[in-house]
């Protein structure tokens, strides 16, 4: 299975890079992982709604360029569906069983995802109603993908 994580912005903090590297190494046993970072646009402090939408569109266009036609796209969005780790593993397994061997997870920038990206998504997923820094969220997503594969393989995982 091919897993892509397409996210806005670069990881600068060493501790986050170390966690991403660790989960990437662990996941190599289960899937081919591709992490794609697109440039985040600068948001002025007093940006209008129109300016924010333009920024989301620019970031969205960069994201869409990296989504393959055959990808099952899962957008991480506050308005998405909240599910358990077991349900998340079922979602990944259902993709595989229905012939979707490529899953693209999409993480937006500080303003979220554009309507174009959300429209392209096959599934909208929320981890919580809380807001997280998108850099930290990448680590959280990798951990849940790793946990999902452990569940699917019947291997022990921390509950």
UniProtKB/Swiss-Prot annotation:
Localization: Cytoplasm
Binding positions (S-adenosyl-L-methionine): 76, 108, 127-132
Classification of source organism: Bacteria, Bacillati, Bacillota, Clostridia, Eubacteriales
Name the record gives this protein: Ribosomal RNA large subunit methyltransferase H
NCBIfam families associated with the record: PRK00103.1-3, tRNA_RlmH_YbeA
Annotated catalysed reactions: pseudouridine(1915) in 23S rRNA + S-adenosyl-L-methionine = N(3)-methylpseudouridine(1915) in 23S rRNA + S-adenosyl-L-homocysteine + H(+)
Organism: Clostridium botulinum (strain Okra / Type B1)
Signal peptide: none
Keyword Plastid part of the UniProt annotation: no
UniProt family annotation: Belongs to the RNA methyltransferase RlmH family.
């Amino acid at each position: 299975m091919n897993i892509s994580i397409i996210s806005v912005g670069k990881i600068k903090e060493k501790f986050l890079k170390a966690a991403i590297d660790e989960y990437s190494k662990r996941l190599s046993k289960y899937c081919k992982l591709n992490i794609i970072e697109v440039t985040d646009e600068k948001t002025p402090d007093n940006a209008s709604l129109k300016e924010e939408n333009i920024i989301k569109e620019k970031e969205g266009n960069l994201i869409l360029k990296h989504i393959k036609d055959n990808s099952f796209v899962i957008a991480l969005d506050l308005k998405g569906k909240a599910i358990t780790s077991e349900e998340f593993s079922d979602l990944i397994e259902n993709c595989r069983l229905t012939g979707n061997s490529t899953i693209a997870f999409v993480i937006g920038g500080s303003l979220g995802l554009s309507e174009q990206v959300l429209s392209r998504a096959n599934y909208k997923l929320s981890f919580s109603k809380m807001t997280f820094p998108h850099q930290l969220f990448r680590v959280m997503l990798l951990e849940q993908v790793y946990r999902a594969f452990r569940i699917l393989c019947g291997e022990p995982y921390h509950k």
